[in-house]
Amino acid sequence: MNFSKVKNKLQANNLNIKDYLTYLTRKGVTPLMRGIYISLYRFNKIKIPFFKGKNTRIIHSNHLITGRFCYIGDFSYINCLSKKGVKLGDRVTIREFAWLQITSDTSNLGEGIVIGNETYIGPRCNLGAAALLSIGDKCQIGAGVSFIAENHSFSANSAIFEQGVTRKGITVGNDCWIGNNVIILDGVNIGDGVVIGAGAVVTKDIPANSVAVGNPARILKERH
């Protein structure tokens, strides 16, 4: 380690050595130790280094496949039980309080989740993927975003809980930026390079290189 570079970095960011070491321990060393434990248990599917946050639960980890340098933040719930599992590319970050669930009923397994290389998912995101949820490479997904890859059927002829669900899936292309608290509904396909403004509700497809905002989301302009 080049200590002069570390010192210069600390000074440039107004950090003292105690703050730096605390951050390094809580965000790096301790999650890495937790990750090594699960990586050894699933060595053929979870690649080292893998970082697992405090009080994070990974259920059915035999259905989880990761690339290198994946990070899952504190207090997250990851239920991987599904037909195709949960597949994370290299350097995927899933921040604190994430909720990923694919299957809620073992008699009707969900499809799975695929997240591409170097994609960042912010804190308190919900990824519900009864149908397949696919997110591309190098995406930035803000805090509190919800993906809902399933929809309830309804009519006036019977009770809601008796009417079942439909499943189409959600696809997000590469290099997309999805703002805080966006909701993306089942059946939506989002092209490469799309920007979606905070709080939008996406109910239909968004073509590549578009900027979309609002509820329901509408195309505002092209991304240049």
Question: Which residue stretches match the model-derived regions?
Answer:
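Glycine-rich hexapeptide-repeat left-handed beta-helix
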Residues: 133-224
